[in-house]
């Protein structure tokens, strides 16, 4: 279930780029600028400049960070993408896994307001995020102290990822829907609903970070 969207304020003339994207964007834009400047008067150079400019444009699209309007619900999606699984766990929690493909926004958001009590980075592999062995991938494990108890969110690296970029330290207060971090390229985010909270999404459903409600009343 996706709550009604509210206006997120005036449109930006220049799209926001995600924090942590500069190491990728600066070289891409620099190369594109040089390719354009050196292509004048040469058809061959112009032809060579096209893929360089296209790559820079693709990078800008990938690292876009659009504003999202406020939405209602105890739990909102932490990621854009498609629900990969909804798994009840032995401890009573429910794990909702959202797979992000390279075309999705890769900035992740807090599913609920709270205080960050843990930000643990675990190194690992870089298997496809939909692979069953991706449980051994690099990840960042977030824990939040919230009004409904402890909530866990896990950012999981995918096949093309080489870094997860957290935005907040332990002790930080975050609002629901606030940006918490970036995963570069295709990846997955898991949200763990506490015991007694039923999921409102199903496998295959498209979700948007900070807008799609994950729980039922």
Curated annotation (Swiss-Prot):
Modified residues (Pyruvic acid (Ser)): 187
Reactions that this protein is recorded to catalyse: a 1,2-diacyl-sn-glycero-3-phospho-L-serine + H(+) = a 1,2-diacyl-sn-glycero-3-phosphoethanolamine + CO2
Protein name: Phosphatidylserine decarboxylase proenzyme
One term of GO molecular function: phosphatidylserine decarboxylase activity
Pathway field: Phospholipid metabolism; phosphatidylethanolamine biosynthesis; phosphatidylethanolamine from CDP-diacylglycerol: step 2/2
Entry keywords, A to Z: Cell membrane, Decarboxylase, Lipid biosynthesis, Lipid metabolism, Lyase, Membrane, Phospholipid biosynthesis, Phospholipid metabolism, Pyruvate, Zymogen
Keyword Lyase in record: yes
Purpose: Catalyzes the formation of phosphatidylethanolamine (PtdEtn) from phosphatidylserine (PtdSer).
Residues at the site labelled Cleavage (non-hydrolytic): 186-187
């Amino acid at each position: 279930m996706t709550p009604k969207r509210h206006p997120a304020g005036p449109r930006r003339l220049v799209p926001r780029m995600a924090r942590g994207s500069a190491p990728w964007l600066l070289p891409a834009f620099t190369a594109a600028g040089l390719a354009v400047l050196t292509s004048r008067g040469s058809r061959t150079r112009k032809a060579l400049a096209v893929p360089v400019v296209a790559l820079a444009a693709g990078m800008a699209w990938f690292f876009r960070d659009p504003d999202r309007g406020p939405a209602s619900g105890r739990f909102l999606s932490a990621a854009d993408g498609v629900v990969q699984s909804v798994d009840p766990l032995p401890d009573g929690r429910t794990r909702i896994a959202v797979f992000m493909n390279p075309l999705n926004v890769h900035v992740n958001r807090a599913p609920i307001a709270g205080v960050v009590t843990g930000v643990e980075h675990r190194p690992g592999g870089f298997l496809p995020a939909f692979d069953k062995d991706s449980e051994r991938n690099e990840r960042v494990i977030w824990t939040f102290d919230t009004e409904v108890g402890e909530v866990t969110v896990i950012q999981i690296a995918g096949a093309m990822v080489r870094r997860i970029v957290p935005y907040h330290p332990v002790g930080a207060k975050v609002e629901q829907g606030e940006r918490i971090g970036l995963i570069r390229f295709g990846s997955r985010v898991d949200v763990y609903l506490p015991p007694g909270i039923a999921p409102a999404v199903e496998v295959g459903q498209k979700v948007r970070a900070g807008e799609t409600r994950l729980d039922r009343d």
